[in-house]
Amino acid sequence: MIDTNLLRVTVCDEGELEKSTTHFIGSRKIEPEQWITWASECKYLPESDAVALCATLIDRLSLEANVVPVSSPVTICGDIHGQFYDLLELFKTGGTVPNTKYVFMGDYVDRGHYSLETVTLLFCLLLKYPNQITLLRGNHESRRISNVYGFYDECQNKYGHGNVHKWFCKVFDVLPIGALIDESVLCVHGGLSPDIRTIDSLMLLDRAQEVPNKGPLCDIMWSDPDDDVEDWVISQRGAGFVFGAKVTEEFLMNNDLSLLCRSHQLVDEGFKYMFNEKLATVWSAPNYCYRCGNAAAVFEIDGNNRSTKYFNAVPDGSREKPDRVVAPYFL
């Protein structure tokens, strides 16, 4: 059973942000309405605003539990990977914030052309509507990965230095690592860990750090399910494990859960059930890396009702293409 005393509700009342569009951190104005307007137009914030945004979220998220409780109805989303215009298409498909409640399962940055604008928009929405959007940490929300696969270079190119990247990574450190929907569905980015048998154990991890190369925090970000595996196998990714139906069913039974929901792996159709519908993979980056040709999906939960909505990539003519090279990489 889950110790519900370990679950901390969101500490910031979004009503306080609704009362006024301007707030302060130190001497810096916090202007969520203006920031959302800019970010929705694929514009990144001035450096001082970006730092203020990050500092505010760090203070708030540091008080959150590792696994945050979420009530349905809610829409679950997978990897985005800097595909800003496809994120807008996702909102057209699933509904806008705050009209639709969302859980995003990580990997907002790297690979796509607009990692900075993508994560900025999501962070601004989180600031304005903390009870309507939950952002989990993925394996790309780390210094080690984002330094290499696009996000650091993008911040460097757009701001002229790496300071903003450092601030975003500080926010990444305190993003929750799981969401528990209706005390029945657990959402994480990657998968399970042989060192974590219960949600209570997951709650006790020290998440406020760089994602390590091994251990349970690493496993939650990096592990994958496999139909051909029964127990635990070391992953060929170089981090995490591959796990099977037996492991999944035992974890669900031990924690009185009905479903494990995750992302982390490209699914051509955008959504895939495994293990007799005990595990679901959601993928929300259509035409991944602008070449894979895959569809994308969002997964809707409303009590015992579950449904999937699919969407495709925005046509090339509807998106701008920056002059920048994406490093060859496929995780």
From Swiss-Prot:
Residues annotated to bind Mn(2+) 2: 107, 139, 189, 264
Active site: 140
Gene3D superfamilies: 3.60.21.10
Cofactor(s) needed for function: Mn(2+)
GO molecular function (one): protein serine/threonine phosphatase activity
Self-association and partners: Forms a complex composed of catalytic subunit pph-6 and regulatory subunit saps-1; the interaction increases pph-6 and saps-1 protein stability.
BP terms from Gene Ontology: actomyosin contractile ring contraction; cortical actin cytoskeleton organization; establishment of mitotic spindle localization; first cell cycle pseudocleavage; G1/S transition of mitotic cell cycle; positive regulation of mitotic cell cycle; spindle localization
Family: Belongs to the PPP phosphatase family. PP-6 (PP-V) subfamily.
Location within or outside the cell: Cytoplasm; Cytoplasm, Cell cortex; Cytoplasm, Cytoskeleton; Cytoplasm, Cytoskeleton, Spindle pole
Keyword ATP-binding annotated: no
Deletion phenotype: RNAi-mediated knockdown causes lethality in 17 percent of animals. In the 1-cell embryo, cortical contractions are severely reduced and the pseudocleavage furrow is absent. Positioning of the spindle is abnormal due to reduced pulling forces that prevent oscillatory movements of the posterior spindle pole during anaphase. In 15 percent of animals, causes defects in chromosome segregation resulting in daughter cells with multiple nuclei.
Cellular component, GO, one term: phosphatase complex
PROSITE patterns associated with the record: SER_THR_PHOSPHATASE (PS00125)
Cofactor note: Binds 2 manganese ions per subunit.
EC number, as in UniProt: 3.1.3.16
Residues involved in Mn(2+) 1 binding: 79, 81, 107
Physiological role: Catalytic subunit of protein phosphatase 6 (PP6). In complex with saps-1, promotes actomyosin contractility during cytokinesis by regulating the organization of cortical non-muscle myosin II nmy-2 and thus contributing to correct spindle positioning. Also required for the proper generation of pulling forces on spindle poles during anaphase by regulating the cortical localization of gpr-1, gpr-2 and lin-5.
UniProtKB keywords: Cell cycle, Cytoplasm, Cytoskeleton, Hydrolase, Manganese, Metal-binding, Protein phosphatase
Pfam families: Metallophos (PF00149)
Superkingdom of the organism of origin: Eukaryota
Lineage: Eukaryota, Metazoa, Ecdysozoa, Nematoda, Chromadorea
Gene: pph-6
Reactions that this protein is recorded to catalyse: O-phospho-L-seryl-[protein] + H2O = L-seryl-[protein] + phosphate; O-phospho-L-threonyl-[protein] + H2O = L-threonyl-[protein] + phosphate
PANTHER family reported in the protein's UniProt record: SERINE/THREONINE-PROTEIN PHOSPHATASE PP2A-RELATED (PTHR45619)
Protein name per UniProt: Serine/threonine-protein phosphatase 6 catalytic subunit
